[in-house]
Amino acid sequence: MNDSQAIIEEAFERRAEISPRKAETLVKDAVEEALHLLDTGEARVAEKQNGEWIVNEWLKKAVLLSFRLSDNVFIKGGYTNYFDKVPSKYADYSSRDFRQDEVRIVPPASVRKGAFIAPSVVLMPSYVNIGAYVDRGTMVDTWATVGSCAQIGKNVHLSGGVGIGGVLEPLQAKPTIIEDNCFIGARSEIVEGVIVEEGSVISMGVFIGQSTRIYHRETGTISYGRVPAGSVVVPGNLPSQDGKYSLYCAIIVKQVDERTRSKVGINELLRNI
């Protein structure tokens, strides 16, 4: 445990006492350092170790403490003004800074300070919240939202209007995670710490939370909270036991390997179901 982590852990236990005018400089500095680590990608709220996603709870605590340490302030935007506790990531960026980061940010995309945007990411008019991590080569399309602490992998496509849910509390809960090389179709919602594993294709209009049934067509089994690697998922319904009604579910219609996915377009995968 480093010094900043220890300070944040201790301060979080008495967070009800903390306010912008009632906090030690030591705590403010530790939180600021943690947010800097998140902002630059040197640390992340969750990381994959030995095939499992591990949550760094102290970084979540730092984000939550930052809300208690900050007043709302006037924030000037290109077309309007704002009033919030968290500054914009790019408020002080110059043209040189953007070129150095190798990112493309289309107005009026909004990224909060404390989110990491990797090189070669394209943000169409979209929103990325504090603590989020967006890895290389990812496209965040128009009106898509990436929630607090969400983890987005390399070469992911978040289509128009996609919602990736944020998870700050409970602290031990995994954030919503979209692994490398996934495609999330327009207006789909992945929330509540659901994990979409590498190379999966989510069709348009699929909604998956922790209580959503995920039906595997090939095996007839039902699972929750995780989409296995290489899955092709569409929206559907399952009948009730008495046959009187049906309820929504997400259906895994097939699973494909990387070789198949590289040869076959996304539309082809979704048509041949």
From Swiss-Prot:
GO terms for molecular function: 2,3,4,5-tetrahydropyridine-2,6-dicarboxylate N-succinyltransferase activity; nucleotidyltransferase activity. Pathway: Amino-acid biosynthesis; L-lysine biosynthesis via DAP pathway; LL-2,6-diaminopimelate from (S)-tetrahydrodipicolinate (succinylase route): step 1/3. Keywords: Acyltransferase, Amino-acid biosynthesis, Cytoplasm, Diaminopimelate biosynthesis, Lysine biosynthesis, Repeat, Transferase. The keyword Acyltransferase applies. Substrate binds at residues 104, 141. GO terms for cellular component: cytoplasm. Its EC number is 2.3.1.117. It comes from the Bacteria. It catalyses: (S)-2,3,4,5-tetrahydrodipicolinate + succinyl-CoA + H2O = (S)-2-succinylamino-6-oxoheptanedioate + CoA. Its main location: cytoplasm. PROSITE patterns: HEXAPEP_TRANSFERASES. It holds the Pfam family Hexapep_2. NCBIfam families: dapD, PRK11830.1. Homotrimer. This is 2,3,4,5-tetrahydropyridine-2,6-dicarboxylate N-succinyltransferase. It comes from Nitrosococcus oceani (strain ATCC 19707 / BCRC 17464 / JCM 30415 / NCIMB 11848 / C-107).
